[in-house]
């Protein structure tokens, strides 16, 4: 099956803006935006807290193109930060800084969010990775979303980067996930029997004043309300470019594999949200060191083993997508650990969260200035 520009990619990363002297967050995104918009146009934007900057790739035809774009974006905002005496870091929580010390961006959207959601919105000082995979067929998109839910805890465990929160070791590998759960319409979605059933759900929420559009459905995976993509939102932002690219390639491959099964009328067993939620909690708590439940076998299996099984599951599509090298980086993450693991190792060695921040700042720009 030739894919022919199916499964295009878009990657959004949200970065911390840091004072490299104090290692604290700084609400200074506006100092980066004027020149940033000249260089990147709509690819750079502020978020609710002014200590965050978001960048997003264009529509990429393959993972190689996505890598070039991600590196270019990281390099550009790192240089913008440096010009202003700042630095950037990629992790889903800041180890030290408090949300109450960050300024809120003046924008009607954020004012409305805070008015509606109150404290959970003000405290939403978390940073994410969103991966869009193109899919034109709406019925296929819903079927793929239903099946892809099963793999969300697996990839979350691979990505975890938020063990610390306001100077505390939370004991979780992805504290970001717990912070975001305080918002409505988040977490693992239920499954839908058709596009029309999903559309009826969205229209009901709009009709009854719950939301004004589908953008306020913040599930871990969702059909994008305005673009023909499935948007994967479950992951922490990895610190290293190679990790981001590996995760994006995994999501692209999962979509391509499930689409292939859909076209062949081969079913994929759908599990209830409550069951997948059990696995998500395990990924949040333990990351790569945990065990997930294999629901078919009704037993616990180490995350690392399940990730290797995931590689086998997608093996027959990765060459057509030209992403074998990128998904195989999973072996490196399994062997060496992810951002959360490295942060915890540094803290165990030095006992100083400033050293953790230093490591994040280094890893975020690792290798990006050696690439033309």
State where each predicted segment sits.
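Metal-dependent DNA replication initiation modules
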Residues: 91, 95, 108, 113-129, ...
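C-terminal accessory/tail domains of diverse enzymes
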Residues: 1-84, 113, 180-372
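An acidic- and aromatic-residue-enriched active-site/binding cleft used to recognize and process polar
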Residues: 20, 86, 91-96, 129, ...
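Well-ordered mid-protein domain cores that form the structural environment of catalytic cofactors
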Residues: 61-126
């Amino acid at each position: 099956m030739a894919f022919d520009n199916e499964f295009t990619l878009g990657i959004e990363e949200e970065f911390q803006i840091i004072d490299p002297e104090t290692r604290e967050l700084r609400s200074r995104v506006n100092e980066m935006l004027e020149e940033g918009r000249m260089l990147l146009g709509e690819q750079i934007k502020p978020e609710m807290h002014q200590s965050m900057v978001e960048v997003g790739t264009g529509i990429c035809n393959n993972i190689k193109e996505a890598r070039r774009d991600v590196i270019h974006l990281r390099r550009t905002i790192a240089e913008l930060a440096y010009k202003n005496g700042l630095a950037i870091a990629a992790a889903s929580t800041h180890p030290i800084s408090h949300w109450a010390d960050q300024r809120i961006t003046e924008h009607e959207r954020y004012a409305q969010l805070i008015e509606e959601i109150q404290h959970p919105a003000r405290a939403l000082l978390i940073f994410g990775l969103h991966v869009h995979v193109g899919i034109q067929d709406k019925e296929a998109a819903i079927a793929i979303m239903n099946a892809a839910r099963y793999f969300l805890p697996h990839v979350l465990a691979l990505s975890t980067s938020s063990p610390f929160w306001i100077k505390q070791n939370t004991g979780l590998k992805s504290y970001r996930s717990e912070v975001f759960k305080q918002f409505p319409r988040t977490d693992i979605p239920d499954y839908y029997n058709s596009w029309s059933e999903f559309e009826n759900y969205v229209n009901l929420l709009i009709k009854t004043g719950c939301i004004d559009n589908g953008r306020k459905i913040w599930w871990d995976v969702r059909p994008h309300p305005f673009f023909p993509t499935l948007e994967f939102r479950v992951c922490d932002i990895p610190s290293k470019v190679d990790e981001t690219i590996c995760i994006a390639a995994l999501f692209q491959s999962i979509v391509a594999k499930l689409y292939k099964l859909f076209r062949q009328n081969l079913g994929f067993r759908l599990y209830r949200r409550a069951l997948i939620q059990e696995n998500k909690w395990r990924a949040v708590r333990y990351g790569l060191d945990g065990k997930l439940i294999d629901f078919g076998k009704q037993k616990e299996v180490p995350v690392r083993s399940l990730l290797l099984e995931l590689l086998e599951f997608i093996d027959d599509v990765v060459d057509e997508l030209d992403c074998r090298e990128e998904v195989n980086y999973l072996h490196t993450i399994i062997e060496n650990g992810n951002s959360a693991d490295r942060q915890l190792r540094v803290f165990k060695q030095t006992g100083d969260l400033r050293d953790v921040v230093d490591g994040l700042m280094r890893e975020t720009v690792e290798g990006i200035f050696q690439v033309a």
